[in-house]
Amino acid sequence: MGLYLNSDRSLKNYEELYRSDYFVDKSLIIERLNKLIGKRSKYLCITRPRRFGKTSVADMVAAYYSKAVDSKDIFDNLNISKVNSYEENLNKYNVINISFNKMPDSGKTYDNYINMIKQSLISDIVKYYPNINPHEFFTVGDILESTGDQFIFVLDEWDYIFSKDLFQENQDDFLEFLTFLLKDKPYVLLCYMTGVLPIKRYSSGSALNMFDEFTFLKDRRFGEFFGFTTDEVLKLCDENQYMNFEKLELWYNGYTTANGVKIYNPRSVIKALENNYCESYWTNTGAMDEVSQYLKYNVLEIRDDVIQMVAGEEIDIIKEKEYIQKFKVENEGKEVLAVAICYDSKSKEHHCKIEAI
């Protein structure tokens, strides 16, 4: 097994999730992905806040497509097994699965980081294609093209170095690496990429412009696959028998997707069911210091907005059509608040509101 190419890591991760007490079947997203294979719309980037199941879905996608594993025993029991394209695509492809949240032990520079990724992928390619001499090629993409095969890419936490504010002087280099690896390459059958914030947040011009982006506020195609729907939470409550849905709804109250589907944060729901107790389970999802400076200096009257919400009132959320490449506080005050405190509504409009529990 390779580290990135045709790894069994995703299947092992998904098996663990599948065996958990409160498993929710999100496999029907695969039916929609199957329709994109080998087409112009094969590049998609799905972004969500932390703890909304992005990595779990990525593991599922890789475990389904990879021909290096046999995942039929699991997927035969899931909803995807009932669709026409199920058998046709199950365990049929070379899969390159990279999570960008790993740092090398040998050093903490950008060169250490990117070379770890490149060398690991090259090593995997040589293992599967022993007749290829990597020294004859200039880029990883050239090596992949020389195989004559096609690949499905599953890329998780693509924006890790941006969200962690690492290697500022090399962030454009990283965008170039992804662009040269993926854009207009005949060996790419499908590229499924996830992150916290959209590509437009960091990129302008032609970098990664081949991707269709699906953000929390604008995703009308995949919204129900990230987070738990009301029906899914009701079913989990029935399985639990001790926790009633009304209590979970009072505490967590859900989020409304772009097409009106109510979504609950998986971590909060699962932890409440495991402990038979509702409280805030949003630990380690984001640093408070990302918000504190805006409150301290009342940037764009954000502090006033928070006071208004604590009083039980709602504030409108400004949804920008595009993200700015270089983030500037003066242009995105409401967006910072939406990300920091979250948005929650029973209507089809987006507001920020704090409710006392």
Where in this protein do the model-derived segments appear?
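Phosphate-binding site recognition
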Residues: 1-319
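Domain-level recognition of nuclease-like catalytic cores that cleave nucleotide substrates
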Residues: 324-357
